[in-house]
């Protein structure tokens, strides 16, 4: 039997991953702007390879498993462990630019979450400022979003923002961007499945080209995206 109540968590997820969410996700390129400027990424195929590598070697092995742990510890009211994983995520950001993005988006969530009905204690505020993933985890718990759907939604949100960067800078046409989304999104189900199986000892990322590009982007003379 159809139930509007059952649909509400999914609708809340759509809101949480929307590009219109005022937390600045669309203002960062995570090094991609420099990679495009220096000719590392010049075609739709090269962009697809770049994003696929980042998705499978970073988000699947670092962000998603950390999000799973933060969500679980917050649900259990174990704030110490949740904060520890926020700290781990922040420490895993290998450039100043990536650390600032994590912190700045966290601050934006601190302003936003109370307006969406999520109360923040001083402990939770510190957590969210450390890592935006804490804000996402709070949303998952508050709105009872199924974890696998939340992980897929998080990946989709990142992917959509990254493809928009490519559309603007490579540049690519809008249709080519949609084709990229169609192709790359096919990796999301397997990525979520893998992320849910990763042990604590396996959590980490390895994307040296992206890290180098992010370092260089901090000093790029002309930029459209924040550093």
Curated annotation (Swiss-Prot):
Keywords (alphabetical) are: Chaperone, Cytoplasm, Nickel insertion
GO cellular component terms given for this protein: cytoplasm
Annotated Gene Ontology MF terms?
Answer: nickel cation binding
Sequence intervals crossing the membrane: none
User: Pfam families from the xrefs?
Assistant: UreF
Query: Where does it live in the cell?
Result: Cytoplasm
Q: What PANTHER family does this protein's entry cite? A: UREASE ACCESSORY PROTEIN F
What family name appears in the similarity comment? Belongs to the UreF family.
Instruction: Share what the entry says about its subunit structure, partners included.
Output: UreD, UreF and UreG form a complex that acts as a GTP-hydrolysis-dependent molecular chaperone, activating the urease apoprotein by helping to assemble the nickel containing metallocenter of UreC. The UreE protein probably delivers the nickel.
What's the protein name? Urease accessory protein UreF
Species, as recorded: Shewanella halifaxensis (strain HAW-EB4)
């Amino acid at each position: 039997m159809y139930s509007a109540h059952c649909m509400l968590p999914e609708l809340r997820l759509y809101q949480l991953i929307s590009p219109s969410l005022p937390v600045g996700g669309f203002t960062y390129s995570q090094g991609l702007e420099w990679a495009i400027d220096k000719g590392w990424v010049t075609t739709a195929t090269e962009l697809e390879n770049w994003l696929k590598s980042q998705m499978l070697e970073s988000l699947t092995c670092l962000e998603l498993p950390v999000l799973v742990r933060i969500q679980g510890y917050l649900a259990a009211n174990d704030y110490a462990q949740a904060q520890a994983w926020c700290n781990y995520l922040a420490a895993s950001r290998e450039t100043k630019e990536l650390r600032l993005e994590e912190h700045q988006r966290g601050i934006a969530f601190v302003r936003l979450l109370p307006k969406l009905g999520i109360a923040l204690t001083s402990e939770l505020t510190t957590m969210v400022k450390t890592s935006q993933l804490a804000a996402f985890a709070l949303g998952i718990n508050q709105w009872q979003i199924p974890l696998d759907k939340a992980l897929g939604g998080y990946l989709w949100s990142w992917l959509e923002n990254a493809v928009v960067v490519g559309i603007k800078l490579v540049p690519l046409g809008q249709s080519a961007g949609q084709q990229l989304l169609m192709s790359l999104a096919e990796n999301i189900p397997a990525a979520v499945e893998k992320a849910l199986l990763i042990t604590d000892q396996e959590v980490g990322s390895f994307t040296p080209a992206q890290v180098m590009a992010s370092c260089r982007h901090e000093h790029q003379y002309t930029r459209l995206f924040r550093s």
